[in-house]
Amino acid sequence: MAEESTTGGFAAEVIDVIGNTGMHGEASQIQCRVLEGRDKGRVITRNCVGPVRIGDILMLLETSREAKKLTTR
């Protein structure tokens, strides 16, 4: 497994906020670029809860899992 930083996660920078998801729109779907670890430089799609904007740094516990793409009904 790749080395983790002292906080127990992998740093990722938010590069795009795609939209809201969840039953009541409480989660945001974002694209982020992994800054360290095995998947360094990879752009992944994740769901996150709470306020987030472009340029924020998130700590991801794992970088291999991606969120499903948003669809409209």
UniProtKB/Swiss-Prot annotation:
One GO BP:
translation
The superkingdom of the source organism is: Archaea
Q: Does the keyword Metal-binding apply?
A: no
* GO CC term, one of those recorded: cytosolic small ribosomal subunit
Identify the InterPro entries for this entry: NA-bd_OB-fold, Ribosomal_eS28
> Which Pfam families does the protein's record reference?
Ribosomal_S28e
Similarity remark: Belongs to the eukaryotic ribosomal protein eS28 family.
Q: What is this protein called?
A: Small ribosomal subunit protein eS28
